[in-house]
Amino acid sequence: MSTTNNSRLDVIDALRGFAIVSIMLLHNIEHFDFIFTPSGLPGWLQAIDKVIWDSLFFLFGGKSYAIFALLFGMTFYIQYHNREVRGEDFRARFAWRLVLLLGFGMLNSMFYHGDILSIYAVLGFALIPVARLSSRWVLAIAIVLLLQPYAWIEFIHALPNPDQKLGDPASWAYFGIANDYFANGSAAKVWWGNLTNGKIGVIRWSWENGRLFQIPALFMLGMLAGRKGVFKEGNIIFWRKTLVTAALVFIPFYALKTWPEAWGIGPAVQRPLLTIVTSWSNVAFMVVLVSTFYLLFYSRAWLAIFSPLGRMSLTSYVVQSIVGTSIYYGFGLGMYKYTGASFALAIGIVLAVIQRQFSVWWLAHHSQGPLETVWHRLTWIGGGSMTHAKN
């Protein structure tokens, strides 16, 4: 696919590439989950760091991964439909594809415990039973999941004693342990810690923050977007309406989640409600980003610069984990000690440019990225022709 030809797949590739870049920038200012503020920074630089931190998390925190999840469901639909028109059922092959993704995810988790691939691999199985349901049923299931049912159960359970004191979320203990080996551990200790302590911590954090309900819901919405063909060129009116609606939904939820102390309720009921409101706020703003990107893509050709990264998203995601942790963790360059958000953002931009140029060079000689090629070939092992949809 040409990165300058504004076809349907190009906008998906470009949007996926945009998500990869924004994820990289967030990971850099977080030092790849090793959040640390260097000492001795001048006041003016601390002020700039705070603006950068707050701005990037406002724009991308909880949204970039959601774009990725939406497009994961979209990609499933494309692959499923391509096999369906041949009279084949893709679901068993997709299950095998998810097993392979879990392998890539565990490899990536060794370097970076915040890996999302392994979680996508497990939750992706939710797409298999809904693949043949009507769009109305799929939408209903997605809405129920987006409502965060477990958080509502917690809220109801807390109503008799709303002022009960709550301890720290369980995930915090795991992250505290991780900070020690991020700073002082050898590479081997970090890698083992990420696969054990870190992985448990991330799963607990994902549960505490409603991600384990939100992710499959976004997969299903992405599948529905594929069915409706909303990413095809010519859907300007749909996306304009979607942008306005999402913005109107986002504003009150963002205000609520930003000032929870104004709610005037006890901590036991505030925590689950904050999980719900934050989840809804992030999804709404994710839709704002997707809508805006679509509307700009067909009028601003330069946005296609993200397409090469989108076509190599698996490779790009894993490589950024390997390189980034080597830059910031103690076993590598230990840059966590010296870089606030400003300098870490600069490092992230440089890495994104390098990854983009590498992707352009690689795709000039190959049809897919290196890890994408391995994933594709293993997906279709024993499946005959290799001429299958590669999006």
Annotate each PLM feature.
Residues 143-221:
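Long hydrophobic alpha-helical segments that form multi-pass transmembrane helix bundles
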Residues 1-72:
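N-terminal signal-anchor module of multipass membrane proteins
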Residues 66-81, 118-129, 210-234, 281-301:
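Specific transmembrane alpha-helix
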Residues 88-89, 126-144, 224-245:
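Solvent-exposed interhelical
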Residues 51, 364-391:
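Membrane-proximal soluble regions of multi-pass membrane proteins
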